[in-house]
């Protein structure tokens, strides 16, 4: 591990030298790439330098134990205790920082929420989930744009798709994919009975046609008239667009905009992200077979979380974590849960790495 860290430190120092060169500063593209590489290494190098400094201080304090002065010995022991407590924590931090980075972590995400079993109550829950993620995105300083939505008469959503843009959105949101189950008394329920319904969430890295090399001949576009809640026509022109990726059969429909051109652009954005996610799912499946352990796939088929309103609790079934702060959670205070999921994924990755070596 330490040879690897020393190698990264040399790389970091080399990048610092290059960035101070006027020649590099004049080439904006090269400067941008070097700045990014420098930024990626900065944290791990800084932690390693502190770790190395602490080891040097530990050796120095052990030397001081040989001193004949009891006061100096006592001070040295105190320092040794403090350093020996800190070193394992820093070593663990370095191991985490050395884990291979997910190349998609920096990306924006396309968030799809669909009402599942439970009829109108499921559609209302889908709307609640979208609002929850919207609040969280606002707290994080991210931007949210609705790409497509299918609203119900009561203000719920059969489906809503949004683009969340900002700093490392995918790294925080990628574990939200799956089936979210809700247990609560619907507003229309007169007997006070608790109903169970569900919504599915898919979090996909934003992609573009260039990244995926989508060929025009692989795409089919169909146009039709937009319809609103209850199926009534809301447009007299054929502005809604359905995009089909012929090789995979993946289909996206967009009708939110009055312009056919805008609906087509949004449809392509969603399609590209679905294709990239399909590639990512396949890669994760291959990795899982190799390691015999599934690390953070965002599997959409399984029930991942239950929201129990009568008890005011949220339980994430993947990590067996229950939080009793449902009201705050639904207002977007989901950071604690996301942190726990990220920590769990890192722990699993460390275990998998240990099994490989």
Curated annotation (Swiss-Prot):
GO molecular function per UniProt: translation release factor activity, codon specific
Keywords assigned by UniProt, alphabetized: Cytoplasm, Methylation, Protein biosynthesis
Pfam families: PCRF, RF-1
GO CC, alphabetical: cytoplasm
Subcellular location: Cytoplasm
Post-translational modification as stated in the protein's UniProt record: Methylated by PrmC. Methylation increases the termination efficiency of RF1.
Predominant cellular place of this UniProt entry's protein: cytoplasm
UniProt key word 4Fe-4S: no
Modified sites of kind N5-methylglutamine: 232
SUPFAM superfamilies for the chain: Release factor (SSF75620)
This protein's record includes keyword Protein biosynthesis: yes
Function per UniProt: Peptide chain release factor 1 directs the termination of translation in response to the peptide chain termination codons UAG and UAA.
Sequence similarity: Belongs to the prokaryotic/mitochondrial release factor family.
Annotated protein name in UniProt: Peptide chain release factor 1
Phylogenetic lineage: Bacteria, Pseudomonadati, Thermodesulfobacteriota, Desulfovibrionia, Desulfovibrionales
Gene: prfA
């Amino acid at each position: 591990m330490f040879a690897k860290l020393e190698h990264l430190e040399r790389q970091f120092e080399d990048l610092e030298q290059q960035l101070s060169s006027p020649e590099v500063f004049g080439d904006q593209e090269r400067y941008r790439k070097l700045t990014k590489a420098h930024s990626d290494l900065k944290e791990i190098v800084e932690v390693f330098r502190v770790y190395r400094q602490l080891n040097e201080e530990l050796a120095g304090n052990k030397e001081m134990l040989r001193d004949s002065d009891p006061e100096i010995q006592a001070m040295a022991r105190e320092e040794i205790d403090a350093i020996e407590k800190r070193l394992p924590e820093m070593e663990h931090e370095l191991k985490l920082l050395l884990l291979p980075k997910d190349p998609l972590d920096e990306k924006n995400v396309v968030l799809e929420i669909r009402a599942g079993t439970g009829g109108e109550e499921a559609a209302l829950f889908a709307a609640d989930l979208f609002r929850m993620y919207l609040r969280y995105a606002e707290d994080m300083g991210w931007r949210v744009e609705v790409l497509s939505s299918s609203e119900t008469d009561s203000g719920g959503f059969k489906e809503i798709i949004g683009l969340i843009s900002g700093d490392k959105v995918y790294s925080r949101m990628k574990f939200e994919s799956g089936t979210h189950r809700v247990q609560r008394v619907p507003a229309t329920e007169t007997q006070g009975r608790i109903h169970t319904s569900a919504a599915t969430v898919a979090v996909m890295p934003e992609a573009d046609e260039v990244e995926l090399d989508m060929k025009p001949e692989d795409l089919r576009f169909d146009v039709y008239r937009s319809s609103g809640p209850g199926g009534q026509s809301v447009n007299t022109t054929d502005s809604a667009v359905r995009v089909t990726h012929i090789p995979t059969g993946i289909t996206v429909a967009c009708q939110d905009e009055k312009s056919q051109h805008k609906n087509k652009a949004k449809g392509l954005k969603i399609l590209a992200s679905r294709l990239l996610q399909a590639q990512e799912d396949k890669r994760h499946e291959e990795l899982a077979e190799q390691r015999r352990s599934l690390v953070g796939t965002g599997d959409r088929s399984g029930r991942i979380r239950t929201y129990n309103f009568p008890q005011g609790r949220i339980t994430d079934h993947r990590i067996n974590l229950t939080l009793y702060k449902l009201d705050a959670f639904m207002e977007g205070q989901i950071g604690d849960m996301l942190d726990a999921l990220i920590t769990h994924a890192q722990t699993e990755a460390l275990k998998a790495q240990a099994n490989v070596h």
